[in-house]
Amino acid sequence: MYVSISFLLGLSHLVLCCLLTFIVNFYLPPESIDFEFMAHNWSKGRSPSSTLGLSWFKAGFRFSDGWSMFYSSGLPGVALPGSPPRSHLLPGTQILIRSFQPCESAKHSARLSSLLTTTSYSVS
């Protein structure tokens, strides 16, 4: 009984991860990005977060247009509207930046002009 419950939980976790990766890769096209500007605006806290029952390590960047970038350990990053989450990232967590909605500010528009493919970042 315990083995079948563990197997089903593991299988559902795998299915959700695959589904999220599929959505990110095929429905969220790359946008413009400036990694130095993003790293400068890094914010992190210690509040735990979970999505669909899965524990994620997330990071958020705050921008003038109110968009945030969400990241999870082992999965591509996703750009979503809303306030940036404040979560603790473990050292060594690999972050893949996959999509970004650039801010409209004239101050940053020139810096946010490079086309994004994939940028990786390792939390130290």
Curated annotation (Swiss-Prot):
Extracellular face residues: 24-124
Glycosylation sites: 41
Chain segments annotated as transmembrane: 3-23
Membrane topology term: Single-pass membrane protein
GO CC term (a single one): membrane
Presence of keyword Transmembrane: yes
Subcellular location: Membrane
Keywords: Glycoprotein, Membrane, Signal-anchor, Transmembrane, Transmembrane helix
Topological region Cytoplasmic: 1-2
Protein name: Putative transmembrane protein ENSP00000320207
Source organism per UniProt: Homo sapiens (Human)
